[in-house]
């Protein structure tokens, strides 16, 4: 395969990452405009964000297995098409309920993109050096999309309207579909994994039940029969999931992974960091445009330090992990996220913009330091043929974290969610204390995850899971 064709394949894969990553920051900037135009309640606005991330979390691992079985290029093209249709439906949504349904469709399409694109990259770039370079470019696109998202979103919302933040996905999807059809070869795994529909279904029940309880509990009342019933379903689903998966030969989630302390702590850190991230983005959009009266464009500019932190500090974090291990980056991330959340407790209706920019910069740098050590710790000590599966679990954990973070906005800061006014900052303060706790978890786990005991636990796990089927490696390309 020629270098030119490989480069075009990488571009088509990166386009999928661009739309999925940019969607997070763009939609958060649009939340106040959507709320005003569609007369949405606070809980409905949480669902606009959470239905997308929940579907991503629920289907990421299944999409990887499906691509292995039926063809990665085929599933990638289907994912792009479904994501484009979901984006079109979002842009035309006449009601908030229709928008939530369209976001569900968007999430289904998005779940087929990044895991399959990574698998395509792994099969096309076979030499270690070129694969590392390709994955470095892939990681850089995340920073670029985060940097572009708030600015592009703010500009589009201010000049065209909030519906345009979904229109922008359509030409990108079209370009990716054409490039994939022309240049990407079909590939399938030599080892077909069995699909685990029962485990998958129980996991989905648990995730949706938990988030429903957190979002609707403050609205309907924590003792409301429907809230209690769905909370009970979530608990039963979790218990059944753990029992079923522990007995299955080829489970949806290999619970033995959690015998590795580095893997377990990586999962905890992924959920903690991304819960803080989801809560921060969602609540600050309401604060900036509702409490402070900033325009969507001004809000996008205030978000910029976060994106710049990701763009410039993510590569630094990767180098630190490569040279010194996960601990320095995790400790730095924990300290910075905790510091940013502490500064957020001081917010008022008249906090100077320079103070906000400092908070966003500190949070952005802290958040950018956490991704590389999470991935590194997740695969630490894992056999090569299980690294993809371990990494997929942490990718899912990231989306679970965002869903929980957004859901907590209503549970912990319901008064602030109910409307703007001079009490917004005060009502939101409990949420920032939760973010402080999440930052401290990252800090504490950062020390523990790299201890000698942790290393030994990973070494003991490796022979137990070696040779099990993995969704990433061993493809036949035709």
Please describe what each predicted stretch is.
Residues 1-182, 314-317, 324, 328-338, ...:
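Transmembrane-helix bundle of Major Facilitator Superfamily
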Residues 7-22, 27-29, 42, 212, ...:
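12-transmembrane solute porter fold
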Residues 177-204, 246-261, 322-323, 385, ...:
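Flexible interhelical linker loops that connect adjacent transmembrane helices
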Residues 1-5, 449-478:
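Intrinsic disorder in cytosolic terminal tails and internal cytosolic loops
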Residues 170-189, 204-216, 233-248, 442-452:
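C-terminal membrane-cytosol helix-exit motif in multi-pass small-molecule transporters
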Residues 96-97, 161, 188-192, 217-223, ...:
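Membrane-interface helix caps and helix-loop-helix hairpins in membrane proteins
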Residues 141-178, 195-203, 210-231, 432:
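Helix-loop-helix hairpin linking two adjacent transmembrane segments in secondary transporters
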Residues 120, 124, 155, 183, ...:
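A residue-level signal for alpha-helical anchor/packing sites in multi-pass solute transporters
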């Amino acid at each position: 395969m020629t270098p030119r064709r490989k480069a075009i394949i990488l571009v088509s894969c990166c386009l999928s990452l661009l739309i999925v990553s940019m969607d997070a920051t763009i939609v958060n900037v649009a939340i106040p405009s959507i709320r005003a135009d569609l007369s949405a309640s606070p809980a409905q606005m949480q669902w606009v964000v959470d239905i997308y991330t929940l579907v991503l979390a629920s289907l990421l691992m299944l999409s990887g297995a499906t691509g292995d079985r039926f063809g990665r290029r085929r599933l990638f093209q289907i994912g792009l098409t479904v994501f484009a249709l979901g984006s079109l439906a979002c842009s035309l949504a006449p009601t908030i309920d229709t928008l939530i349904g369209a976001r569900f469709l968007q999430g289904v399409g998005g779940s087929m993109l990044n895991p399959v694109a990574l698998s395509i990259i792994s099969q096309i770039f076979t030499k270690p050096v070129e694969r590392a370079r390709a994955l470095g470019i892939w990681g850089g696109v995340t920073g670029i999309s985060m940097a572009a998202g708030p600015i592009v979103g703010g500009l589009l919302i201010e000049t065209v309207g909030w519906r345009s933040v979904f229109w922008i996905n359509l030409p990108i999807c079209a370009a990716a579909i054409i490039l994939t059809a022309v240049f990407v070869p079909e590939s399938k795994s030599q080892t077909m994994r069995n699909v685990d529909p029962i485990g998958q279904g129980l996991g989905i029940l648990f995730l949706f039940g938990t988030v429903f309880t957190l979002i609707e509990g403050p609205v309907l009342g924590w003792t409301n029969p429907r809230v209690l019933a769905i909370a009970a379903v979530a608990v039963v689903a979790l218990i059944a999931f753990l029992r079923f998966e522990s007995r299955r030969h080829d489970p949806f989630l290999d619970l033995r992974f959690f015998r590795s302390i580095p893997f377990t702590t990586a999962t905890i850190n992924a959920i903690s960091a991304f819960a803080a991230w989801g809560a921060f983005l969602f609540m600050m959009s309401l604060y900036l445009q509702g409490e402070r009266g900033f325009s969507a464009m001004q809000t996008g500019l205030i978000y910029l330090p976060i994106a710049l932190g990701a763009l410039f500090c993510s590569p630094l974090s990767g180098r630190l992990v490569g040279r010194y291990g996960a601990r320095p980056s995790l400790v730095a991330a924990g300290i910075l996220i905790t510091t940013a959340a502490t500064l957020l407790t001081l917010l008022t209706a008249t906090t100077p913009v320079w103070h906000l920019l400092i908070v966003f910069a500190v949070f952005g740098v802290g958040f950018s330091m956490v991704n590389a050590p999470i991935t590194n710790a997740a695969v630490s000590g894992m056999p090569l043929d299980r690294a993809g599966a371990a990494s997929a679990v942490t990718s899912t954990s990231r989306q679970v974290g965002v869903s929980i973070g957004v859901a907590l906005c209503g549970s912990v800061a319901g008064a602030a969610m109910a409307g703007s006014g001079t009490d917004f900052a005060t009502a939101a303060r409990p949420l920032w204390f939760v973010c402080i706790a999440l930052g401290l978890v990252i800090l504490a786990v950062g020390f523990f995850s790299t201890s000698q005991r942790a290393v030994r636990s990973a070494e003991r796990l490796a022979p137990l899971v070696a040779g099990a089927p993995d969704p990433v490696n061993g493809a036949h390309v035709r």
